[in-house]
């Protein structure tokens, strides 16, 4: 193998080509590779953050669902208590109304009984005086008749 001027010329051209590539071609290629590497790393970080956010969102949704169920159960329990309270109040009101009506009816019965007793006393007194007049055969004056009826009614 002969080393001649062509080989030296080619070596110099190759060396200039390598310097040219190192100066003008290689830096943009390296920059593009580094930028691409940074974008990929950022994308992986974003994916990891999104996965963590998704997991947190699932946990938060589960917690809110549990809280909503607990709140719904509490509302149902309060509604049941209120319904029982309303039923008890209605029962107490009905009982009180029944007792009031019973007392009112008892008072009316007593009043009617007293009225009937008074009327019966007056009738008995009148009958007694009439019977006494017939037995005695004489009439008793009105004043004596009134006193006798009052006395007899008081005794009965």
From Swiss-Prot:
Any GO molecular function:
proton-transporting ATPase activity, rotational mechanism
Membrane-protein topology: Single-pass membrane protein
Q: Which UniProt keywords apply?
A: ATP synthesis, Cell inner membrane, Cell membrane, CF(0), Hydrogen ion transport, Ion transport, Membrane, Transmembrane, Transmembrane helix, Transport
Q: Which residues cross the membrane?
A: 12-32
Which InterPro entries does the record associate with it?
A: ATP_synth_B-like_membr_sf, ATP_synth_b/b'su_bac/chlpt, ATP_synth_F0_bsu_bac, ATP_synthase_B_chain
Show the GO cellular component annotation of the record: plasma membrane; proton-transporting ATP synthase complex
Task: Give the principal location in a single coarse category.
Answer: membrane
Question: Taxonomically, which superkingdom?
Answer: Bacteria
**This protein's record includes keyword Cell division:** no
Q: Where in the cell is it found?
A: Cell inner membrane
Write out the similarity annotation: Belongs to the ATPase B chain family.
Q: How does it assemble?
A: F-type ATPases have 2 components, F(1) - the catalytic core - and F(0) - the membrane proton channel. F(1) has five subunits: alpha(3), beta(3), gamma(1), delta(1), epsilon(1). F(0) has three main subunits: a(1), b(2) and c(10-14). The alpha and beta chains form an alternating ring which encloses part of the gamma chain. F(1) is attached to F(0) by a central stalk formed by the gamma and epsilon chains, while a peripheral stalk is formed by the delta and b chains.
Q: Please explain the role this protein plays, according to its UniProt record.
A: F(1)F(0) ATP synthase produces ATP from ADP in the presence of a proton or sodium gradient. F-type ATPases consist of two structural domains, F(1) containing the extramembraneous catalytic core and F(0) containing the membrane proton channel, linked together by a central stalk and a peripheral stalk. During catalysis, ATP synthesis in the catalytic domain of F(1) is coupled via a rotary mechanism of the central stalk subunits to proton translocation.
Q: What is this protein called?
A: ATP synthase subunit b
């Amino acid at each position: 193998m002969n080393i001649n001027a062509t080989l030296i010329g080619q070596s110099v051209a190759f060396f200039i080509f390598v310097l040219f590539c190192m100066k003008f071609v290689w830096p943009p290629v390296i920059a593009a590779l580094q930028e691409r590497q940074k974008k990929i790393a950022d994308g992986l970080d974003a994916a990891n953050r999104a996965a963590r956010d998704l997991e947190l969102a699932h946990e938060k949704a589960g917690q809110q669902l549990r809280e909503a169920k607990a709140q719904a159960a509490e509302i149902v329990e309060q509604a049941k208590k209120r319904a029982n309270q309303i039923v008890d109040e209605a029962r107490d009101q009905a009982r009180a109304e029944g007792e009031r009506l019973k007392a009112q009816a008892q008072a009316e019965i007593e009043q009617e009984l007293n009225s009937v007793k008074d009327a019966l006393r007056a009738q008995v007194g009148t009958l007694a005086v009439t019977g006494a007049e017939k037995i005695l055969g004489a009439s008793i004056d009105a004043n004596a008749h009134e006193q006798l009826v009052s006395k007899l009614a008081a005794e009965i």
